[in-house]
């Protein structure tokens, strides 16, 4: 049962990472369209879903300092 739980957690983390990457992509698209607030929200959501996603953190920091 512990193995099943560990596998479920692993699959969930993999799924959340995929979702976070999608939010980073949307953030980049918003940046390219000069939609700063939408980009910020997308990067924040990516970090919420997968806190160790460094690209979203870098992009968010850069946007917040503009």
Region spans (language model):
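Conserved structural position within tetratricopeptide repeats
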Residues: 14, 47-48, 65
């Amino acid at each position: 049962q512990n193995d099943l739980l560990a596998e479920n957690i692993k699959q969930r983390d993999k799924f959340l990472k995929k979702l976070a990457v999608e939010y980073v992509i949307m953030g980049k698209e918003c940046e390219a369209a000069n939609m700063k607030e939408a980009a910020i929200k997308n990067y924040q959501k990516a970090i919420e879903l997968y806190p160790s996603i460094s690209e979203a953190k870098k992009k968010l920091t850069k946007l917040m300092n503009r």
